[in-house]
Curated annotation (Swiss-Prot):
Name under which the protein is recorded: Fluoride-specific ion channel FluC
Source species, domain of life: Archaea
Membrane association type: Multi-pass membrane protein
Signal peptide start and end residues: none
Binding site for Na(+): G74, T77
Keyword set, alphabetical order: Cell membrane, Ion channel, Ion transport, Membrane, Metal-binding, Sodium, Transmembrane, Transmembrane helix, Transport
GO biological process: cellular detoxification of fluoride
Reactions this protein catalyses: fluoride(in) = fluoride(out)
Organism annotation: Nitrosopumilus maritimus (strain SCM1)
């Protein structure tokens, strides 16, 4: 990795981590579902979907992928916190909440990524 590539990666990582911190600063819980992790995962997936289309459409240099996809979205989203929350629900015998947490996080994240790609494709084609 060259110096400028590192700068792109680091800048995206710092911004993504900062936004994640701000969103997860005060835990949001609906029934037993930890919504703050869901929010960062869905937002990150949507932004990644938008970026994928922009990157393809504009033939963006790989440094922008380091910034947006790997740095920003990678630091914003959180598989480890999702896994921890799910593990805690399992350990507390909250099986319904566990199933809901998994289905909602995975389903909405995939839906958000597809939605971001679809929205950006529509905007670009018009």
């Amino acid at each position: 990795m060259k110096g400028l590539e590192f700068v792109f990666l680091a800048a995206g990582s710092v911004l993504g981590a900062f936004l994640r911190y701000k969103i997860t600063e005060s835990p949001l819980i609906f029934n037993t579902l930890p919504l703050n992790v869901l929010i960062v995962n869905v937002i990150g997936a949507f932004i990644l979907g938008v970026f994928i289309v922009l990157s393809q459409q504009w033939n963006l240099d790989g440094r922008y992928s380091l910034f947006a996809a790997i740095g920003f979205c990678g630091s914003l989203t959180t598989m480890s916190s999702f896994a921890l929350d799910s593990s805690n629900l399992l350990e507390n015998n909250q099986y319904g909440a566990l199933a809901a947490n998994i289905i909602v996080n995975v389903g909405l994240s995939i839906g958000a990524l597809i939605g971001g790609k679809s929205l950006m494709s529509t905007i670009i084609s018009n």
